[in-house]
A protein has these predicted regions:
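A structural signal for small-residue-enriched, beta-sheet-centric alpha/beta enzyme cores
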Residues: 2-91, 95, 101-408
């Protein structure tokens, strides 16, 4: 992180971007913003990654179509309705793009729509027709604009999620900004996770897509809150090029750019996992000693996905057998008998399992460690050099309450 400087501004920090959030009427609570608009001053190189669910939101169909040429200039996002499994969904998403294009004076196929909320609900164009002109009038290239947009895309999130950082390329300052939402239905390949990133680096569309496709599997696809892969998972990245710093694939500058994207993605992955519905603790599982990267990723995600282990973490119970169980049912060519497990927080560390067997520890000390709000699960498979991380949260009574009342 020493080469990457944290700065204010969120998604509006890079040159050439403005954002806004308004209440347009999709959500019944008038105090909640439910429409976000992000605009670039110029046509941008664009990249996207989406849900692997066979059922996917209508906006994703439109995004894929609009990004075929590798360029876009605006993103419009609503919360409160997923626009998924609606008979007029695709046409409504296209009509939304038409309204944005008219208000901003850009091409309709340069607009990328996105939605989050309840699946299978009727949706009309009226809230968009009302809200998009209001959002266009409110566009601001500052921290407030980013914050309003980040707030407008929230559903059961408890707080907005934003980040921006700056780094140097060829003596020029390059910035990356991002906003995200996601609290439940998070088990990506990608959560509903929506994440929008901007940069003022000059990157060709193909190189930008490759960079995003490199970062997503190592970060956002390593989050699990509840094991449900959403229908609307979307990550979009726009590059304005207005910093003047050109980044070409296969160069050290490109590697730096990917590292910066990874820094942003890891930060937001932790934010998303820690804000899981009803969560009281962020869980981070680091696997070392794996025979290959795929195994390292699979094992780390298996651990933080285990319902039994997540419940144990809520109760501050060092039930390491549940960790070993989750490792054991994970595919991969490794010798389980070489596995060790440690549990760590700012309160200390306990070594609970060595060579897949009990390692003497104090239950009282373990309880102190596990009462903290961030817990590290350190797994060494002893079978190679590969490593990976995954992020999740504990499973609480409130998760059931939130999802039992979601549509009421």
């Amino acid at each position: 992180m020493s080469d990457f400087k944290s700065i204010p501004g969120g998604i509006c920090a890079p040159k050439g971007f403005s954002a806004a959030g308004v209440h347009c009427g999709i959500r019944h609570n008038h105090s909640k913003l439910d429409l976000a608009l992000i605009k670039a001053d110029v046509r941008c190189a664009g990249a996207g990654c989406y849900t692997t669910n066979k059922v996917y939101g209508a906006p994703i169909t439109v995004d894929r179509e609009h990004l075929k040429d590798g360029y876009a200039q605006a993103i419009v996002v609503n919360s409160g309705n997923a626009n998924t499994c609606a008979p007029n969904g695709v046409q409504l998403a296209k009509d939304t793009c038409d309204i944005v294009a008219k208000e901003l004076g850009i091409r309709a196929d340069d607009v990328l729509p996105s939605s989050t909320g309840v699946i299978g609900q009727a949706m009309s164009i009226e809230p968009f027709a009302k809200g998009i002109p209001e959002a266009a009038a409110k566009l601001a290239a500052d921290e407030a604009g980013s914050h309003d947009a980040a707030t407008a895309i929230m559903t059961t999130d408890t707080h907005p999620k934003e980040i921006a950082l700056e780094f140097a390329v060829g003596g020029k300052a390059v910035r990356i900004g991002a906003i995200a939402k996601g609290s439940g239905m998070i088990h990506p390949n990608m959560a509903t996770m929506l994440l929008f990133m901007t940069t003022d680096a000059k990157v060709a569309p193909a190189a930008l897509q490759k960079a995003l496709s490199t970062v997503v599997p190592a970060t956002f696809n390593q989050i699990s809150v509840d094991g449900d892969t959403s229908t609307n998972d979307t990550v979009l990245l726009l590059a304005s090029g207005l910093s003047g710093a050109e980044i070409a694939e296969g160069t050290p500058d490109y590697d730096t750019f990917v590292a910066a994207l990874t820094e942003v993605a890891e930060h937001l992955s932790r934010e998303l996992a820690g804000d899981g519905e009803g969560a009281t603790k962020l869980l981070e599982c680091t696997v070392t000693g794996a025979p290959d990267l795929a195994t390292a990723r699979a094992v780390s995600k298996s651990v933080i996905h285990s319902t039994l282990f997540k419940a144990a973490m809520f109760g501050a119970d060092a039930n390491w057998g549940r960790v070993l169980c989750a490792i054991g049912y994970t595919p991969g060519d490794f010798d389980i008998s070489k596995t060790s497990v440690r549990l760590k927080s700012k309160a200390g560390e306990v070594f609970v399992c060595e060579n897949a067997a009990y390692h003497a520890y104090s239950e009282d000390e373990a309880a102190v460690v596990l009462k903290e709000d961030e817990i590290d699960i350190l797994v060494d498979l002893g079978s190679g050099d590969a490593t990976a991380k995954a992020w999740g949260c504990d499973l609480t009574y409130d998760y059931v309450k939130i999802n039992g009342d979601y549509r009421t």
